[in-house]
A protein has these predicted regions:
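Active-site substrate-recognition segment that forms the wall
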Residues: 184-217, 231-233
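Glycine-rich FAD pyrophosphate-binding loop
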Residues: 20-40
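Beta1/beta-strand and adjacent pyrophosphate-binding region of the FAD-binding site
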Residues: 1-11
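Conserved Rossmann-like nucleotide-cofactor binding loop
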Residues: 11, 34, 149
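Conserved N-terminal helical subregion
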Residues: 1-3, 20, 45-173, 177, ...
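Flavin-binding catalytic cores
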Residues: 219-240
Length: 240
C-alpha cells in the first residue's frame, strides 16, 4: 500500500512516520524548495509525548527539548493565579523548538520519501494528489497536512473562509542560559493581552506576547509600547 502525504510540517512528518510503522509506503510532497526553520516553540503535553513515544521519538524530544514540570498563570503584578503541577500528576511535558522537533522527525524518515519543490493543488477521492506542473501522484491514501490554507481541504470540501481568533501575537526564541526559568512555563495575563515564556531546550527560551485587537486593525510599526498592560511596568517587557 502506498500513501501520499502533502506537507512536511510537524503533522505531515508525524503521519509519515506512523504510516512507515504500519507497513505503508508513504511519499511526502512539500512545496518549499528546502526545509527551513519555521515557527518557534511548542509545549508538548502528556498526550503529545505519548503520541511521539509511539513514533519512537520520546527520547529524542527529551534530549533536544527541556522538561517542563509546572505551568504558572500570573497577573500583571506577578502574583500567582493558577499553578499546574505536571510532575505531581505524572504528566510528562516538554518545551522544544519546532525546528528541533522537525529535524528529529526528518531523521526518522528515509530521505527518498521526501519530494521538495513539489506543489500540490488538490486531490481526488480516488487517491490522486494533483500537482501544478507534473502528472498526479497516486496512493491508496492521501493525507492533507498542508497547513491553514490547505489545497487538499479546499479541493475536497470547497472554500472555507478563515475565522479571526481575536488576537495578534509576536513570537521568538531567545538564548537564555542562566537557569532562572528552570522547568516552568509562565503566562502573564494583562488587560487585553499577555506574555508567556518557557524553556525550549539547548539553552533556548520560547517566548510570545499577544494582544486582543479588532479584525483588520493595523499592526504597530514598532511593538515597543504595545504591551496592553500585559506587564507592570510595560517597559520591562520591551526593554532593549
Amino acid at each position: 500500500m502506498q500513501a501520499v502525504v502533502v506537507g512536511a510540517g510537524i503533522g505531515g512528518l508525524a503521519a509519515t512516520i506512523a504510516l512507515e510503522h504500519a507497513g505503508v509506503e508513504p511519499i511526502v510532497l512539500e512545496r518549499a524548495p528546502e526545509l527551513r526553520e519555521a515557527g518557534f516553540g511548542l509545549v508538548l503535553s502528556a498526550n503529545a509525548v505519548m503520541a511521539l513515544d509511539s513514533l519512537g521519538l520520546r527520547d529524542v524530544v527529551a534530549t533536544r527539548g527541556a522538561r517542563v514540570t509546572q505551568a504558572e498563570i500570573r497577573n500583571p503584578r506577578g502574583e500567582l493565579l493558577t499553578l499546574i503541577d505536571y510532575e505531581a500528576h505524572g504528566w510528562e511535558t516538554y518545551g522544544i523548538l519546532r525546528s528541533s522537533l522537525q529535524q528529529a522527525m526528518l531523521e526518522a524518515i528515509p530521505f527518498d520519501r521526501l519530494r521538495l519543490n513539489t506543489t500540490c493543488i488538490g486531490a481526488n477521492e480516488d487517491g490522486r494528489a494533483l500537482l501544478d506542473d507534473t502528472d498526479p501522484v497516486t496512493g491508496e491514501i492521501v493525507v492533507g497536512a498542508d497547513g491553514i490554507n490547505s489545497a487538499i481541504r479546499r479541493s475536497l470540501f470547497g472554500e472555507e473562509p478563515l475565522r479571526y481568533g481575536g488576537h495578534r501575537a509576536w513570537r521568538a526564541g531567545t538564548r537564555f542560559e542562566d537557569g532562572r526559568i528552570g522547568e516552568r512555563f509562565v503566562e502573564v495575563w494583562g488587560v487585553g493581552g499577555g506574555f508567556g515564556f518557557g524553556p525550549a531546550g539547548r539553552g533556548r527560551v520560547y517566548w510570545y506576547c499577544f494582544e486582543s485587537v479588532p479584525e483588520g486593525a493595523p499592526a504597530p510599526e514598532q511593538p515597543r509600547g504595545s504591551s496592553s498592560a500585559a506587564t507592570a511596568p510595560g517597559s520591562t517587557l520591551f526593554r532593549p
